[in-house]
Amino acid sequence: MEVTAKLKGAPLSAQKGRLVADMIRNMNVSGALDVLKFTPKKGAKLMLKLLESAIANAENNNGADIDDLKVGMVCVDEATTLKRISPRAKGRANRICKRTCHITIKVSDEE
């Protein structure tokens, strides 16, 4: 059985999110939780909360045993970019792109 949790519009660039996603892909759930707790990145905190949500979904909706769960797919895709303007000298302006991403985590109890 495969259980999914999604976070849409996370305030994180997809490139930085993929660095964290690569660390926990194909790990068992308890190991992935430990890695995320001690990783000093903004994306780790977001993925920790999302992984805990996926574990709760598997436990409550499907009655899965937490010890058997593994992190299957971790997908970080680009979402909309918020465009902001920063004033510069002589009436000019620079564009600031605040990037967001969609994060999807699938946990499963199958090998």
From Swiss-Prot:
Q: Which domain of life is it from?
A: Bacteria
Q: Which GO terms describe its molecular function?
A: rRNA binding; structural constituent of ribosome
Give GO BP annotations, semicolon-separated: translation
GO CC, alphabetical: cytosolic large ribosomal subunit
Q: Name one Pfam family in it.
A: Ribosomal_L22
UniProt keywords (A-Z) are: Ribonucleoprotein, Ribosomal protein, RNA-binding, rRNA-binding
Say yes or no: keyword Thylakoid present: no
- Gene3D superfamilies recorded: Ribosomal protein L22/L17 (3.90.470.10)
Question: Mind telling me which PANTHER family this protein's record contains?
Answer: CHLOROPLAST 50S RIBOSOMAL PROTEIN L22-RELATED (PTHR13501), LARGE RIBOSOMAL SUBUNIT PROTEIN UL22M (PTHR13501:SF8)
What this protein is reported to do is described as: This protein binds specifically to 23S rRNA; its binding is stimulated by other ribosomal proteins, e.g. L4, L17, and L20. It is important during the early stages of 50S assembly. It makes multiple contacts with different domains of the 23S rRNA in the assembled 50S subunit and ribosome. The globular domain of the protein is located near the polypeptide exit tunnel on the outside of the subunit, while an extended beta-hairpin is found that lines the wall of the exit tunnel in the center of the 70S ribosome.
Subunit notes for this chain? Part of the 50S ribosomal subunit.
Family per similarity comment: Belongs to the universal ribosomal protein uL22 family.
The protein depicted here goes by the name: Large ribosomal subunit protein uL22
